[in-house]
Design a protein with these regions (language model features):
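Cytosolic regulatory regions of ion transport systems
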Residues: 1-120
């Protein structure tokens, strides 16, 4: 069983939660949108509404306690990049970030991502 932090509870984030939940992993979801949090609640053990670009908010989650952190933010690459970087600064063990293009993947890998996925 792994402790997983899922930042971004949109379509891709919800899909990840749906895959991890039946395997017994403990998943915490974070999003700025209450509706998306409500949609992912059946598949996670905990969820919070918050800004993942805020270092104090992330620190309050206990980043070092998660085995893996997924950054699945879509539509705002700047927020995804900032979140990825902050996670590593705060002691994240392993960060998987979402990219839509190769140039985004390069930036993410240079700024803290251990792995990059292309969901579409």
């Amino acid at each position: 069983m792994k402790n997983v932090l899922l930042i971004g509870a949109g379509r891709f984030g919800r899909h990840i939660a749906m895959q991890l939940s039946p395997l017994g992993h403990q998943v915490m979801a974070v999003d700025t949108n209450e509706e998306r949090i409500n949609d992912v609640l059946p598949f996670v053990t905990n969820a919070q509404i918050g800004d993942s670009t805020n270092a104090e908010f992330l620190r309050s989650l206990g980043i070092g306690n998660f085995d893996v952190c997924f950054v699945t933010i879509s539509g705002n690459f700047q927020n995804s990049l900032e979140t990825t970087s902050l996670l590593k600064e705060l002691g994240a063990k392993y960060v998987v970030s979402r990219a839509e293009r190769d140039v985004q993947a390069k930036f993410l890998l240079r700024n803290g991502a251990d792995n990059v996925v292309y969901p579409e």
